[in-house]
């Protein structure tokens, strides 16, 4: 059985915390489509921090992720997630792979003897993981674009 985190399948949304506001991850979809036939559809989704279970199930169905089971956990701490994964490992007998985007959870699950895969997309860094970049206010961006457009226009006019 493959246990894959919901964060692998969907990108976080800046608009809302609801699962329905998320967009599917192209890399997550490729990973899903690779493992699904190899493990005869024995794929489980691990949704941590999700409060709207029905909305999550509808999102998975709408996006074409046919999981054999979906496990929900309201608490989104590292310890709670690792404990639930250990419980699922005991219930299902053997988890072939656990796939997640959180390196702390992957390290602890791997330490407990479950094969893991840390999924990252190096060319896109999540804002919460980046320490060097800060979000700019929209007004600041608009001012900067306007200033660049004015400078470009002035450069083209020359002395008239």
Q: What do the predicted segments below correspond to?
A:
Residues 1-80, 159-160:
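Alpha-helical substrate-recognition element adjacent to the catalytic core
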Residues 53-160:
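C-terminal cap/substrate-recognition subdomain and adjoining C-terminal extension
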């Amino acid at each position: 059985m493959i246990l894959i985190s919901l964060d692998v399948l969907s990108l976080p949304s800046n608009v809302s915390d609801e699962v329905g506001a998320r967009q599917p991850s192209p890399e997550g979809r490729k990973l899903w489509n690779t493992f699904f036939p190899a493990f005869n559809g024995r794929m489980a989704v691990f949704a941590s921090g999700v409060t709207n279970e029905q909305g999550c199930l509808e999102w998975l169905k709408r996006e074409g992720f046919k999981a054999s089971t979906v496990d929900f956990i309201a608490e989104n701490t590292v310890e709670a997630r690792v404990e639930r994964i250990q419980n699922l490992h005991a219930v299902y007998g053997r988890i072939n792979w656990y796939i997640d985007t959180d390196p702390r959870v992957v390290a602890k699950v791997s330490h407990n003897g479950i094969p893991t895969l840390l999924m990252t997309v190096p060319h896109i860094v999540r804002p919460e993981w980046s320490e060097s970049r800060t979000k700019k206010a929209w007004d600041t961006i608009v001012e900067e674009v306007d200033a660049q457009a004015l400078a470009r226009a002035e450069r083209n006019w020359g002395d008239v």
